[in-house]
Design a protein with these regions (language model features):
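Active-site core of metal-dependent hydrolases
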Residues: 1-42, 48-64
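Active-site microenvironment of metallo-dependent hydrolases
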Residues: 45-52, 62-220
Length: 220
């Protein structure tokens, strides 16, 4: 009813569920505007940048190619106001976004896009430039002299694990297949038996089907 398009939805007992809803997002669609504003309000109302992460459901409604634009919206309240002025006439009746004057600093952006997610995931060698870090480094042009979105969309230099992969804004032809990053957080091992009981009562498959076997570890 929202879009008039066909949709697909499926559920397989309690193991999985998936769905496809084709959406054409439009500036003058109030529902779409509120969807967008909800995320922006969370970013701007949560005072501690360590408690919010810049992440999207790529490649669906929020491709990561939009990160530079999102960063500009967070760092520049004037640009945010100009964008809001083109939205649905009743936008301000349903959201507080227009009244929020906060602007993210470069440090805030580094936290929500790098340091915060790495810390939350327990990746001790990611998200910082200290001893033992993997030397994942991006070098940008000066934000004060350039459009924010353009700066973040086109880094001047990028180092991945200490190896340069972007030079003078150009991608070098030395990329390799990436690695799967894993972490091993501490937990109460007694919880496994409780989960196993639930599997036996409610699931059609065994909990052992969820374990990752050794043959998948070669790229970890």
């Amino acid at each position: 009813k929202l879009s008039g398009n066909k949709w697909v939805n499926t559920d397989v007992e309690m193991e999985t569920g998936s769905g496809i809803v084709p959406m054409n997002y439009k500036k003058k669609n109030l529902v779409n505007d509120i969807q967008w504003a909800t995320g922006m309000e969370l970013f701007l109302k949560i005072d501690d940048p360590w408690k919010v992460f810049l992440t999207t459901d790529h490649p669906n409604a929020g491709p990561f190619t939009a990160y530079p634009w999102i960063i500009k919206l967070l760092m520049n309240k004037s640009y945010r106001a100009d964008y809001i002025s083109d939205l649905h006439a009743k936008f301000d009746e349903y959201t507080d976004l227009s009244s929020l004057d906060r602007e993210y600093s470069l440090s805030d952006i580094a936290v929500i896009s790098r340091s915060g997610p790495a810390k939350a995931l327990g990746l001790k060698n990611k998200g910082h430039l200290g001893v033992g870090a993997d030397a994942d480094i991006a070098v940008y042009n000066n934000i004060s002299d350039n459009d924010i979105a353009e700066v973040f969309a086109h880094p001047v230099y990028v180092f991945k694990s200490g190896r340069m992969i972007v030079k003078d804004g150009e991608l070098l032809n030395n990329l390799e297949i990436g690695r799967t990053l894993v972490t091993k957080p501490d937990y109460d091992e007694n919880i496994i038996e409780l989960i196993r009981e639930d599997f036996q009562k409610y699931y059609s498959i065994s909990i052992d089907n969820y374990s990752v076997t050794d043959n998948y570890y070669d790229k970890v």
